[in-house]
Amino acid sequence: MTFQNTREFAKQLDAQDALNHYQEQFIFPKVNDKRVIYFTGNSLGLQPKRTKAYIDEVMNDWAELAVEGHFYAEKPWWDYQERFSEPLSKIVGALPSEVTVMNTLTVNLHLLMVSFYQPKGKRYKIICEEKAFPSDQYMFQSQVHFHGYKPEDAIVEIKRREGEHNIRLEDVLAKIEEVGDELALVLIGGVNYYTGQVFDIKTITAAGQKAGAKVGWDLAHAAGNIKLELHDWNVDFAAWCSYKYMNSGPGNASGVFVHERHHNDPDLPRFAGWWGHNKERRFKMEPNFDPVHGAGGWQISNLPVLSLAPYLASVEMFAEVGMDALIAKRDHITSYLEFILHEIDKEVESTFEIITPSNPEERASQLSVFLHGEGRSLFDYLMKNGVITDWREPNVIRLAPVPLYCSYEDMYDFGQILKKGILGK
């Protein structure tokens, strides 16, 4: 399809978009009494209108049933998390038994590293990407310290080549081979938060395991955003947050994946708690831990149902839409946004550069735009004019055209506002 930078063409694309009506199912902030153009679903997704009803249901059950809500609520609280197994399994490409919800992202990665980072002898090193999200960096450093190693020795970062913004797959594979029998764990972000680069999870997982290491993934920017087949790709473990593309609300619960081949391994260590205990015997208060079969055996504490309610509202919407439809629109609307940016770049003196890969196979619902010069003032201009974007140091505006609530006309309007902002500087 040949794109056009006109409002009429954008409206035509919206009219043909099977997901366009979902935009009306979200609540948008307003600037100057006008609905914003929202590009920050990669930081915090918008609130679905249905969310309040899910929360109200829990609040009403709490008011009317109090403690009995654990067993007699409309959706009983004691097994509330099981409602996520089926929809989450489809979002991340897993068996229902391989996924659960609990805690928050970095907490879950720490807990999973208890099981899957077991340094021994000369096999103690961790491979991660250069400039991983800071929370991951702090996690790696603290885990390595805990086991008695020095981060500068035990943490191996895969570097970008000089003058390049993204990490080459061949460099990831070469680093895994180089570290070889010293490698204990590969843990990379499925989508890099800064550049929007999508990593080849299947190929990297196979390479890490061939080297004798466990392979896990931080899917904070991947879950609900890219096609995942965690079970078929033989991924050892993964975790993700739910408040970005999955629209569950600020700081909300995380999801975890543990491959089924690890479920019955008696030698695999884990930190345990009563919510990971055999569900049928949980309230018998027995002294010895008998883990729930599957990823649920990694749960520790009673789950925060009020937090899970908006998460459930979101995953049920995902089940309605389906990942294939989301990804099809994601690729198309991201390409249209890329086209708009290139058109603006032709019209004005070049002040920016898209650092996200141009290959649709290597990106998802994000374009990271590196701004030369006084980029922060352009970001501020966009915000004042109703375009909510995300600023990341150094000098990058991240744009996430989330397919559930962004329209093609939004892309056109953004381009016009961006052009005025650049020319007005």
Curated annotation (Swiss-Prot):
Keywords: Hydrolase, Pyridine nucleotide biosynthesis, Pyridoxal phosphate. It is an enzyme of class 3 (hydrolase). GO terms for molecular function: kynureninase activity; pyridoxal phosphate binding. Homodimer. It comes from the Bacteria. It comes from Flavobacterium johnsoniae (strain ATCC 17061 / DSM 2064 / JCM 8514 / BCRC 14874 / CCUG 350202 / NBRC 14942 / NCIMB 11054 / UW101). The keyword Oxidoreductase does not apply. Catalyzes the cleavage of L-kynurenine (L-Kyn) and L-3-hydroxykynurenine (L-3OHKyn) into anthranilic acid (AA) and 3-hydroxyanthranilic acid (3-OHAA), respectively. Pathway: Amino-acid degradation; L-kynurenine degradation; L-alanine and anthranilate from L-kynurenine: step 1/1; Cofactor biosynthesis; NAD(+) biosynthesis; quinolinate from L-kynurenine: step 2/3. Belongs to the kynureninase family. This is Kynureninase. Pyridoxal 5'-phosphate binds at L105, T106, F133, P134, S135, D136, D218, H221, Y243, W274, N302. Its EC number is 3.7.1.3.
